[in-house]
Amino acid sequence: MKDRQRPPVLIIGAHRSGTTATARALELVGLQIGQRLDSHREPRLLQKLHEDYLRRTGGAWYNPQPFLKWIESVEGKQDCISYLRLNVRRDFARIFGYRFNPKGLWLRARLNFGRPWGWKEPRTTLFAPAWLEIFPGGRIVHVIRDPRAAASSIRERELKFQAAGDPPTPNLADLNYCRQLVQAYLTAGERFANSANYQRVQFEELQANPPAMLERLANFCGLRFTTRQLAGAAASVRPARVKSTSS
């Protein structure tokens, strides 16, 4: 029966690039992305799974270069694949955000009957080569936002965290560093740009025309949806903020 489980949809992109809004909208048109998720529609255990391995390599989500260098090697890629595969076999449900309650069991059972599913977690952008070995045929939805806007948003969030009393995250108060970080994620995601299973979405275009962009994405993901579902999903996407011309 498990042979009928579809390959997942991986929603990737740099932090603060619109991946949350995109994932929420796709969920509303039928993409199953788990039930035990944080406010950004991410499974916490998947975040930890990724971050623990990043730190093994001397990196972190905000310092991906050591990991990216490691996974380029045959040894590094195979080690990463083994790490992810072992953990998924042990704890598929919790890693992908499913509870051990009747609804969670029902949601997981639907996967065995071909329900479209996937997940959103920005670090997946870095880990995608390994995930696609574990789930051959997986589809990539790569959400891209203007790099300057994404970098500014990362820095602004960091400064808010510090103002609230959180310890500083290395280098994230530096706008130039944030720009380099966004570019590293962008380059990592574009490794798959020549694949038929890759779909790039410019977040500003999604904000400008949610119905058309979401319909295209939903079709790419193999979703079946109603006009009402599409309208509801489109309404969930906030329009871009209009900046004052005096600023």
Label the model's feature ranges.
Residues 1-99, 164-167, 172-178, 230-247:
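PAPS-dependent sulfotransferase catalytic core
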Residues 40, 147, 205-207, 232, ...:
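Residue-level detector of flexible, active-site-proximal loop/helix-junction positions
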Residues 31, 159-160, 239:
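Residue-level marker of structural boundaries
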Residues 35-38, 222-233:
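Short, surface-exposed acidic
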Residues 105-228, 246:
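PAPS-dependent sulfotransferase catalytic domain
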Residues 28, 33, 149, 208, ...:
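Active-site micro-motifs of SAM-dependent methyltransferase domains
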